[in-house]
Structures are given as structure tokens and as C-alpha cells.
């Protein structure tokens, strides 16, 4: 399989990677170790937005992790009915079915960010190298499927979890150096716990009211039927409370743990 060409907006910086300067160090452990990952995946870069953040007051950001899945098209239908754009942090596979769903998400005007290729916490958080390898796989699939290079991502388990304590800071530093921005959330639907319609609806509305810019975590796996069933009513209720809806980008101030 051949990878799609990387668009002009995604490029390595002109500066020499940190790993080359590390060779000059008198400490052999430094020269052979910590920063060697900076030379990995030389096309894995994004143009970092450095302007002012857009006004996100009274704006809801619906985010869906772990898809696409057999429920993606149903979810897209309800979003389309309400004329709402959302953000999908995907766990993509190299299958035509997945590629077609990624294209459908993108063509509908939603934002696609990287979540993970494997969602294997122990594997991806073992080192910065391991994280980059997993991220690059998901990144390339999205790029090949949609022609658009994602520049935002969400850590599996969130940016603070039991698996990334030793590697978290180095991963964030390296991903920031490469131009990528991560988003956590401030409202958790807890749909992963299998809650029914009423509980999801009540919890999301109650928690969303605490923020002027709620970033709501949902999931788009194949067993999250209730998320699909409740989403339209949640959108209508939040609209009635005066909220607008948007999709995440680097122009939105990120919610980070």
C-alpha cells in the first residue's frame, strides 16, 4: 500500500531536528537516547496555529471518540438533521469500510482528529517512539482516506491517565514541537458505562450548564446505541438554552487536563 502525498500544509520545520545536536553531547546516554525520536516520521508535522483564539463563548463542542463504526452513519444523520458540526477522534483501520466512513465524516464538514491506531494503552504509552508510531499510523489512514491531514488529537484515556505518567510530558513536548494540539474534555457523558437514554440526557445537560464552552465526550463504538438515540434531543435542549455548536480546531482554545 502506498501512502498519499502529504499536503503542503504538513511539513517538517527547516530547523535541524534536536536529535542531531544531541550527538555533540559528551554524555553518551544522551546522544543515543532521549531525543532520538525527533528524527522519526519526518513528514509527521502540522502547521501550528499561533494566532488569537476564536470566541467560543456559548458554544458546545460535541466530540466522539473511538469510531468510525456501524453507528457512524446514524450519528451523522442526526447531526445533519440539526445542522450541527462535530469532532471525531478516530481509531481508524486500513479497510475500505473504514475509509468510506472517514470520507463521509469529512465530506459532511465535521473535523477529524487522531485518537489512536491501536487504543492499546500499555503499548502506546511505553515510550515517545511508541506513541509516535501509533499516532502516525492513524494519521496516515485519515490522510489517505480524506486527503486532509489532521492537526488535533486526543489522548486515549485523556492526557492524564494511569498509563502515561512517565511519558506524558515528553509526548506532549514532542507533539507540540511537531505542531499538533491535543484536546481533553470538560463534560463526560459516561456513555461508555452503558447508561440509558434518560441518564445520558440528564447528566450531559446538567454538566454542560457549568461551562460557557462545553467540550462533551461521547463515544462512537458499535455498542453505543443510546448515544445515537439521545444525541438529537441533547442538541435541541442545548439550543433552547442558547448554545451554538462548533467543531474543534487549533483556533479554539483547547481544554486540557
Give each language-model segment a name:
Residues 1-57:
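N-terminal, intrinsically disordered, polar/charged segments of Gram-positive cell-envelope systems
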